[in-house]
Structures are given as C-alpha cells and as structure tokens.
Amino acid sequence: MPRHGRRGKLPKGEKLPKKEGGDNTPSKLLSSMLKTLDLTFERDIGMLNGKSVRSIPNKKTLLELQSQLDSLNEILGTIARGDQETIEALRKIRDSKNEKQANDEKQETSNADGQHESSTATEETNIIDKGVQSPPKPPPSNEISGTIENDVESIKQAADNMAKEEINEDKDLQVHRDQPREKRPFDSETENRATENENTQRPDNKKQKIDVDKMENDPTVKNPKSEFVVSQTLPRAAAALGLFNEEGLESTGEDFLKKKYNVASYPTNDLKDLLPGELPDMDFSHPKPTNQIQFNTFLAFVENFFKDLSDDNLKFLKMKYIIPDSLQFDKTYDPEVNPFIIPKLGPLYTDVWFKDENDKNSAYKKPSPYSNDASTILPKKSANELDDNALESGSISCGPLLSRLLSAVLKDDNDKSELQSSKIIRDGGLPRTGGEDDIQSFRNNNNDTVDMTLSQENGPSVQTPDNDIDEEASFQAKLAENKGSNGGTTSTLPQQIGWITNGINLDYPTFEERLKRELKYVGIYMNLPKDENNPNSDDPDWVTGREDDEISAELRELQGTLKQVTKKNQKRKAQLIPLVERQLAWQEYSSILEDLDKQIDQAYVKRIRVPKKRKKHHTAASNNVNTGTTSQIAQQKAANSSLKSLLDKRQRWINKIGPLFDKPEIMKRIPNESVFKDMDQEEDEDEADVFAQNTNKDVELN
C-alpha cells in the first residue's frame, strides 16, 4: 500500500517545478517577494513596513513581482492537486472499510437468524412431545467448520479487494491527475455506491456523519502532525466563548457597529472637527535639530493669536479712525480731510543743487537757469511775432491754461509716420522713390531757402510762403477726412473742408483771459483752489500748486485706495463688535464656571481627607473619644452641606446661563468660514464693471 503525502505536500513521485532562481517553495517565494518590494515583516505588531506600503513601486519591480506571483500560483496549484488526490484516496479507504463492516454485520445477523430458527424448532418439538424435555442438540461439526471457513474466506476476499482497489487507485491517480475535480470518476463512483447502499446502510448513517464531522473539524484527525490550525481551532473556540462573529449580520447599521465594538452607543459623526488638525504622516524618530526654538519663545508668538479678548479690543473696534499718538491732541488735524490733501510742490532738485554749488563758491555766483518765478509761465506776446529764433527762447509763450488744452488735443507721436506715408500717395498714385529728379526739383524750387523736408514732417514753418501753406492746409484737410472715415484717434480734431476762418490777431494774454471767461460761462473753470500768496486772484497757483506730475497722480491713486480700504474696515469693525461682545460674555461665563469647579474640588478634597490620629491619653480616653467622634461628625456634615450647595450652584449656573451660548467645543473652535463672506460678495458685486450689462446686451443683439 503506497504511503500518501501529508497535507500541503506533494505525492512521493512528484516534484515541484524548479525555477531558474532556485525559489521552488512557497516560503522562499514569499521571502523573495518581500525582498523585491523592499518590505519587512514586523512580528511585534503583525504588519508590513517599508517604502512600498505608502508609494507605488516602479514598473520593473511590478513586472518581477508578477512573475513571482505566477510561479507561486503554479506551485500552490500543484500542491492543491496533490492534497485533493490524498483526500480522495482516504475517502476510498474509508468506503472500503465501511463496506467490510457492513458485510461482517450481515453475516453476523444471518448466523444469528439461523441459530434462532433452530432454537424455535426444538422448542416446538419439545412442546409437541408433551413436556418431554431434552437438552438442545449442538450444531453439527460440519456447520461449525463451514462457518469458520466462510469467515476466513470472507476476510481473505476483503483483503484481496482492498489490495486491488489500492492498485487501481494508484493507476487512476496517475491517469486522472490533471483532470478537474468535477470530472473525475471517483466522486461519481462514491455517489453511486452511496445510492446503492442507502437502504442497506441506514443504521450506519449517523456513524458516518460523526466520522465525517470529526475528520473535517478535528485537527488531530485531519492534520495530526500540526500543533495549531487557525481555520479549524479559532472559530470553534470563538463560538464556545460566545465572542462576536460578523457572519450572518449586516455590514451596515448602528446595531452591527455596537455589537462589533461592544459599545452602548456608536457616534454618527467621525469627530474630525474636534481634532486640532490633520494627523501628520511623518517619521518622528529622527534626532531633534540643534537650533530648536525655545518653548517660551513659541508661546510668546502664539499668545497674540490665542489670548483672551479684553475691553481694549472692543474700544479699538469702536474707534472710527486710527490716529497716531502724535496727532491725538492736534485740533487742526481732521482724519477725514488731511490724509486726502496733496502737499504743494517744493523746490526742484536742480534749484537745490545749484544753490548748494553757489554756497560753496560764493565768489562765482550765477543765476539759476531753473526758476519757479510766475513770470516764466505767464502768456507773452502773440503768434504773429513767432519765428524760428523765438522758439528756443521763452520770450513768446501761451498761458498755462491754453498750453494744457493744446496738449490735450495735439496728435500723438506715432501719427508722424502715418502722415509721411500718406503724403507720398496722391489720389491713388504710386509712392515716390525719392530719386535725383525730386532732389533737383527741390533744389530749383528752393528760392526762399525753405526746408521742405522739415515742413513736411513738422508742418509749415513761420517763413513758409502763403501758397505753400494753403496747399498744405488743403492736404491736411483731405488727410483728416480720409482718416475720419477710416477711424482716427480721439485726440485729433479734423479740419473742415469748404471754408476757412479768418484768423484774429490776438496776443496770448488776451486769448488766455477770453478762454477763462468762456470756460467759466460753461461751468468748467470754477471752484478752483485759491493761491495763498495771491488770495484776491481767481487763478490757481500754477507754480507750486500744480498737481499734474507723476507724484501727484500716484498720490491721487493711493488716496482713492485709502478711501475704499477705510470704508471696508469700518464695515468690518461694525460687524465684529457684536461677535466680540458675545465672546467677552462667554469668557466671563467660563471664568466663573472654572472658579466654581475649583471650589468644588477643594470641598471634595476636604470631605475625603482623613483626620490625623492623635496620641491616646490613658487618663481620659473615653471622654476624648466621644468628643472626637462628635466633632468629626459635625465637620463631615458641614463639608457635605457646603459641597452640596456648591454643586447646586454650579448646576443652576450651567442651566440658566449656559443655554445663552453655543456648545463649549463650538465656542472654542476656529470658525470654518469667514465672518466677512457675505460682505466680500457684496463688495465684489459693487466693484464689477458698470458697462458689463450694456456689453452683454450688445452681444445678444448681434
């Protein structure tokens, strides 16, 4: 009879498939897989540890792991097939033993029936013989010898059958080793035998069930050489102890969670909001840094953010404007006016530097070429007296108001290139190449020594003849018309064609005064800041009171931002005042509650304090004992009454004042949303583009 392998082992004639690496057992394969993934097994906690636990390995590692898993699957499949064959062989042996027992029982029952019939026949003959009794005849020797021979023959036949079955089993195991379990003939044969022997083996069904249950659940029968099997031992032990088992229960629901964690109530919230923050997933086993910050320094930094509020904070919020200490008692300072005043211009750095040079060289003093004298900006003479020589000097100039208006309507600098390119195209003609013919004609026509190139680029000069000026004016009118049809800039004023106004010879001072009167009549030149040096004049201070420089523009922009920020801060402070008042009330409530808790702790300590034992005096021992017990009882009653009154006071304080506030964990928690959320949305809507609606309408119409 061949010896079958144990569970988890291959049959004797079969070997595991060998790999190139030499890892041909499951344990070696598992250890090599751990090395591939760079993992270690911590026996203390029963978990894996390594880099691959938190991050995904690279592709090369995963491919190597896949090959190892395939080989492990193949080896485990081979072992599983060997185990299945061993189990089927054991079933065959068990069935043969059961058949042998059944045959033996049948023979015993048949022999017993024959003996019973012979005994009944002898009894009947005795009765017929009228009470004549005779000893029972022993069975003949032939019968005894026949029964013995039959028993021996049956034993020999059973042994031969068992040997033949074992030989057939070995052959069938070799032939049907690669077949799945469902298609093997062993199961069908056992099923047929079971159906055939159902009627004959009914008394033995209970015994067979007991044997099957014992083989499947008893580790000593199924796996006799293993000391401990988890799948066979722990479930039965847990059921015997009445421990929790998830089988048969729903995986969701509060009752399931209560039974699983053995608690009276299970929270519906994960309590994440009560945590101080996200739990760090870091390794804190590294040594501390050498330049570690002191704890007192950290507390001093954090205290500004977590300290209790006070009345000073409320007073600060109720202040409309924050005024520096140096301006607190200055009555001339107005926080609504002074921050938005642009100071007057001081002396130019060129003047300051020139003055410093003159102070150093007092013997060689020179007049400053840069001066802030009002006479330098006043209108002088008229345009009729203007020539090329007067352009470099300041003897002829227009007033400050006219110069600003002219600068607002002058052409841009980039219009010069367009003017040059359009001049060389006449009525759809080709542009000139500027050859020798043009140069020769230019030289021949240059009778009055006029620079035509300069006149073409910068307009007519003061010495240009009248006919050339008229031609240039007509050309400018056509150019303006073409540019107006194609779209020009807003800073150019196209000239009208068909009429020419007769110029009035006005000097610049007169023209400046007429311009002021017209602007006042329209309502523009009004409510201007007065000149402090000349209060009787209606004109502003054009020298030091100008606000058209870059610094003044930047100051105006910053002042506009200051107005918006001041308005926003006032709204936010008004919204914070009720919140701070509520927080101050909560702080007062908490401080009183803490005082009550301290008093209760002190009273409880006095109540449970054991009095010191005094030395006994033998003379008046009885009197001292009586007085001691009475005083202790009185003190105990007083302590109990004071503790009870404190507890009642604390309970009344919590029940009466506590409902005015939210829960303590909510009052101490940092809010999840900003208290200015709605205000910020309103400000964003106010700062939106006012032309957005019109633009959308135009888009819809188009």
Swiss-Prot record:
The modification Phosphoserine is found at S134, S407. Residues 1-29, 90-224, 611-636, 672-702 are annotated as: Disordered. Disruption phenotype: Increased sensitivity to genotoxic agent generated DNA damage. One of its GO terms (cellular component) is ADA complex. Residues 109-125, 620-636 have a biased composition (Polar residues). A motif (Nuclear localization signal) lies at residues 606-618. It comes from Saccharomyces cerevisiae (strain ATCC 204508 / S288c) (Baker's yeast). Belongs to the NGG1 family. Residues 1-10 have a biased composition (Basic residues). This is SAGA complex subunit NGG1. One of its GO terms (biological process) is chromatin organization. It comes from the Eukaryota. GO terms for molecular function: transcription coactivator activity. Component of the transcription coactivator SAGA complex. SAGA acts as a general cofactor required for essentially all RNA polymerase II transcription. At the promoters, SAGA is required for transcription pre-initiation complex (PIC) recruitment. It influences RNA polymerase II transcriptional activity through different activities such as TBP interaction (via core/TAF module) and promoter selectivity, interaction with transcription activators (via Tra1/SPT module), and chromatin modification through histone acetylation (via HAT module) and deubiquitination (via DUB module). It holds the Pfam family Ada3. Component of the 1.8 MDa SAGA (Spt-Ada-Gcn5 acetyltransferase) complex, which is composed of 19 subunits TRA1, SPT7, TAF5, NGG1/ADA3, SGF73, SPT20/ADA5, SPT8, TAF12, TAF6, HFI1/ADA1, UBP8, GCN5, ADA2, SPT3, SGF29, TAF10, TAF9, SGF11 and SUS1. Residues 680-689 have a biased composition (Acidic residues). Keywords: Chromatin regulator, Nucleus, Phosphoprotein, Transcription, Transcription regulation. Residues 11-22, 90-108, 162-219 have a biased composition (Basic and acidic residues).
